[in-house]
Design a protein with these regions (language model features):
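Short alpha-helical basic/polar micro-motif
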Residues: 139
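Charged, low-complexity helical/coil segments in non-catalytic cytosolic or luminal regions
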Residues: 142-155
């Protein structure tokens, strides 16, 4: 049963949105300006494609230069109900002819050492509000970079042709 919204709910929502405009937005803009001026965030990303295959519930990753050399494996859980899928199920079995013939993309993102140092300094100086604002901004920027990288990888692998153009819609 859908609850109808009363006038009080509408006023609460409007007050909340006004608080965002009056209070939160200026703080965000202040921090974004400071981050740009002082170079507090230094976004970096590294990603690559590695040969891989499935061994039971594990995805086994191999060296791209020496395809028989195992770099590591990810033992993954299987769903406890429903179809009982495991992420490894979506990779080609290593017992198939030709060895590792699937690919797994790997990525890492960072906002840099300066961001880490700045957050620690704010916390140590008991500037908790500033610490939380800066830390939150850094985390959101790292997440956005990870999402952007993921979209790029999907595009490079040809999976993105039918996906929305706007990142927020992916």
């Amino acid at each position: 049963v859908e609850r109808s919204r009363g006038l009080g709910d509408v006023y609460k929502r409007q007050a909340y949105e006004q608080d965002l405009i009056d209070k939160a937005e200026p703080v965000l803009q202040q921090w974004m300006t400071r981050v740009r001026q002082e170079g507090l965030l230094t976004p970096r990303v590294a990603y690559g494609y590695f040969p891989c295959g499935r061994d039971g519930n594990a995805v086994v990753v191999f060296d791209p230069e020496e395809r028989s050399k195992e770099l590591g494996r990810f033992e993954l859980p299987r769903q406890r109900s429903g179809n009982r899928y495991c992420i490894a199920d979506f990779y080609r079995d290593l017992t198939a002819e030709g060895g590792p013939s699937d690919v797994i993309p790997m990525q890492a993102v960072t906002m840099g050492e300066i961001a880490t140092t700045t957050a620690k300094e704010l916390f140590a100086a008991d500037r908790y509000s500033d610490y939380l604002y800066f830390h939150g901004l850094g985390v959101q920027m790292a997440e956005a970079l990870a999402e952007w990288t993921h979209a790029r990888i999907r595009s490079e692998l040809g999976f993105a042709a039918d996906e929305p153009q706007a990142l927020r819609d992916v």
